């Protein structure tokens, strides 16, 4: 049986024979948390779950890096927020006055979005609170006492060496409040002297938490403080001579702690662009949960190896992704054949890793997203009518073919209604114009040729006198008519769309027509109303 990469990581970690495995993750709270920079927690959770499956104790720790300096004003804040640049996120006021501070304003929606993922044994930490509560005090003391060696380690990977009076600490300036413009140059006991680019000179007692270790030292210190045994992180940290390489040496030599098992991952781009909180180019987990269930986000993350490039689009490509997920689900339940046994094992394992809970005994009802975008608009969102459209177009699984909407089980009904809501939200927010339509109650003002009128007339007669088991049969019948008239398919289908929705384009014609009330279509094609 093939193994998923999260399983292999768990098995390798288990060789360490620890009483508990703590999988670390962290996110900088510089604005809205998006799926591009929050993969850490989802990967960490998956590894923790795999460890527990093989009988190990494991938990996930997520650290909010909320003491880092604000470097850019995040979207959609006004530009006058630039006055807070350089200040720790934790010390910046809430932009709307609804939360305690900047951090809570952006962190709260993300943390709430984690609830549907049911992350077991999750511990959430605040970097700022860790400093303020003295958690980093001992590590800061050790780092300062070993400044010379830390400087040497840094310089091995720098083009320009650090100054001789450099200290691995960033004080918060008591004058301007910035943390990234101060230069710590001397210390005595717990007091650190610093100069700030604003012109202020001062001292800070590091036990008060009014400053922080420089990043690569902080990361190494955090590993030891929290006993981290494995940590996923973005590929930028994994670059040669990057954060992980430097922090690993510091962890080994300065803090006498083995660096965690690294799991670097590729960033997720959005429609080909790098996600950027400052530019407003991002897609959040909470946005995902409005158009898809949490398992589908897991599937998106875990279907490929972590360093494989990933580009996400919430537009038409999202429907393709949902089609893929549904296919994988059918294969996992033995409802569809995979191309070979190897593919079956691989896809089934991906599906299992993607699940929040154990797989239900029966495969969930999975009406096609793509078909629902059409059925939803025809039925104006009426669930009963949508179900009837699915039934009339052979879109129901065999076990539901003779089940009415009213008789659906609670599980099937909830699944169906939830997917309808997802499709509604997708249409409202991301559906392209060419996907959207409205069935016109009255004949729209249109121009059609005599040839198109004849085509519509013949189709109306066929609908009146013949029955079709599926849309394929009706599609073939329409082609017989247009070929007998010597018409181009485009002209024929334009006539259908023009008379029903007043547009030249629309959904797949055969299933669309069969989804509508037959008497309505016959009258409309005869141009009677």
Swiss-Prot record:
Keyword Hydrolase among record annotations: no
UniProt-annotated binding residues for ATP: 277
Extent of motif 'HIGH' region: 29-37
Gene Ontology CC terms, in alphabetical order: cytoplasm
Pfam family, one: tRNA-synt_1f
This protein's UniProt keywords: Aminoacyl-tRNA synthetase, ATP-binding, Cytoplasm, Ligase, Nucleotide-binding, Protein biosynthesis
Predominant place of localization: cytoplasm
Reaction(s) catalysed (UniProt annotation): tRNA(Lys) + L-lysine + ATP = L-lysyl-tRNA(Lys) + AMP + diphosphate
Top-rank EC class of the record's enzyme: ligase
Compartment(s) where it occurs, according to its Swiss-Prot or TrEMBL record: Cytoplasm
Motif 'KMSKS' region per UniProt: ranges: 274-278
Entry superkingdom: Archaea
GO biological process: lysyl-tRNA aminoacylation
GO MF annotations in UniProt: ATP binding; lysine-tRNA ligase activity; tRNA binding
Enzyme Commission code(s) on record: 6.1.1.6
Family membership noted in the UniProt record: Belongs to the class-I aminoacyl-tRNA synthetase family.
Cross-referenced PANTHER family: LYSINE--TRNA LIGASE
Official protein name in the record: Lysine--tRNA ligase
Lineage of origin: Archaea, Methanobacteriati, Methanobacteriota, Methanomada group, Methanobacteria
Gene this chain is encoded by: lysS
């Amino acid at each position: 049986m093939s193994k998923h990469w999260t399983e292999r990581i768990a098995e390798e970690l288990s060789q360490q024979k620890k009483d508990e495995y703590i999988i670390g993750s962290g996110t900088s709270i510089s604005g809205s948390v998006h799926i591009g920079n929050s993969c850490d927690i989802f990967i960490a959770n998956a590894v923790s779950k795999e460890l527990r499956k093989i009988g190990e104790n494991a938990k996930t720790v997520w650290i909010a890096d909320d003491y880092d300096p604000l470097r850019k004003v995040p979207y959609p804040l006004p530009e006058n927020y630039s006055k807070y640049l350089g200040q720790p996120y934790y010390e910046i006021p809430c932009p709307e006055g609804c939360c305690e501070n900047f951090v809570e304003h952006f962190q709260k929606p993300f943390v709430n979005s984690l609830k549907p993922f049911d992350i077991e044994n999750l511990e959430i930490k605040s970097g700022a609170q860790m400093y303020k509560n003295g958690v980093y005090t001992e590590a800061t003391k050790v780092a300062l006492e070993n400044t010379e060696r830390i400087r040497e380690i840094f310089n091995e990977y720098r083009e320009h060496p650090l100054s001789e009076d450099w200290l691995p600490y960033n004080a918060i300036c008591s004058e301007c409040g910035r943390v990234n413009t101060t230069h710590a140059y001397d210390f005595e006991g717990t007091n650190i002297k610093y100069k700030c680019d604003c012109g202020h000179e001062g001292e800070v007692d590091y036990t008060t938490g009014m400053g922080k270790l420089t990043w690569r030292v902080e990361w190494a210190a955090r590993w030891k403080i929290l006993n981290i045994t494995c940590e996923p992180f973005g590929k930028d940290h994994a670059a040669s001579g990057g954060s992980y390489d430097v922090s690993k040496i510091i962890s080994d030599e300065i803090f006498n702690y083995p660096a965690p098992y690294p799991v670097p991952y590729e960033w997720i781009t959005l429609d080909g662009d790098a996600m950027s909180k400052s530019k407003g180019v991002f897609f959040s987990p909470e946005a995902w949960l409005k158009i898809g269930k949490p398992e589908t986000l897991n599937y998106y993350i875990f279907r490929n190896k972590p360093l494989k490039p990933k580009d996400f689009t919430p537009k038409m490509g999202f429907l393709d992704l949902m089609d893929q997920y549904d296919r994988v689900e059918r294969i996992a339940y033995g409802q569809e054949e995979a191309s070979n046994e190897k593919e079956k094992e691989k896809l089934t394992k991906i599906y299992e890793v993607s699940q929040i809970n154990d797989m239900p005994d029966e495969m969930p009802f999975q009406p096609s997203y793509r078909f629902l975008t059409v059925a939803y608009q025809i039925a104006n969102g009426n669930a009963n009518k949508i179900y009837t459209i699915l039934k009339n177009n052979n879109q129901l699984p065999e076990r539901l073919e003779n089940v009415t909407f009213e008789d659906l089980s609670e599980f099937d009904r909830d699944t169906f209604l939830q997917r309808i809501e997802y499709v509604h939200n997708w249409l409202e927010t991301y559906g392209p114009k060419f996907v959207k339509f409205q069935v016109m109650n009255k004949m729209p003002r249109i121009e059609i040729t005599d040839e198109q009128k004849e085509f519509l007339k013949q189709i109306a007669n066929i609908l009146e006198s013949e029955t079709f088991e599926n849309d394929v049969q009706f599609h073939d019948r329409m082609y017989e008519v247009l070929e007998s008239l010597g018409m181009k398919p485009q002209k024929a289908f334009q006539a259908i769309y023009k008379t029903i929705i007043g547009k030249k384009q629309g959904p797949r014609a055969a299933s669309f027509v069969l989804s509508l009330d037959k008497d309505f279509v016959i009258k409309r094609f005869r141009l009677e109303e």
